[in-house]
């Protein structure tokens, strides 16, 4: 297992065996940009989280299966409670939406080695959900202020 503390995020990863014929890799990362951006007075506060995994199983020397996945969550809030509400920050807040995005991909590949030939069967599924929300003057108290 290995951990990483970066300038804008923290993460952990691990890999190894899950038995005699199976191996794994996994990692997770999360940003703390929202705290840094708040400290330096920026009007938006982004946060991201992502994770990935891979599992590989060898049935025998001629057949193997690999399953993998990745996913991410992006979340950007507006820093409307700033002490320094400069004209520049007011302008940025006037047009920036709140952003919420989720995405993932899952996949698998089955490989069969036959002499000099390789046969593969591959399946995958991906999805992205993207939601941007903007209220006039960032006032969420009235539904009619919703503009995006």
Identify what each model region corresponds to.
Residues 17-99:
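Periplasmic-side early beta-strands and strand-to-turn transitions of outer-membrane beta-barrels
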């Amino acid at each position: 297992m290995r951990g990483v503390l970066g300038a804008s995020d923290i993460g952990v990863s691990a890999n190894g065996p899950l038995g005699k014929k199976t191996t794994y890799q996994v990692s997770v990362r999360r940003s703390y940009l929202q705290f840094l951006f708040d400290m330096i007075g920026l009007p938006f506060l982004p946060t991201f989280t992502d994770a990935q995994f891979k599992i590989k199983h060898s049935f025998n020397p001629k057949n193997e299966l690999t399953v993998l996945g990745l996913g991410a969550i992006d979340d950007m809030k507006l820093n409307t409670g700033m002490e320094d509400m400069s004209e520049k920050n007011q302008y940025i807040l006037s047009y920036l939406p709140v952003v919420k995005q989720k995405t993932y991909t899952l996949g698998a590949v089955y490989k069969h080695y036959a002499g000099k030939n390789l046969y593969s069967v591959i399946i995958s599924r991906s999805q992205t959900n993207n939601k941007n929300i903007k209220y006039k003057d960032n006032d969420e108290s009235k539904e009619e202020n919703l503009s995006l």
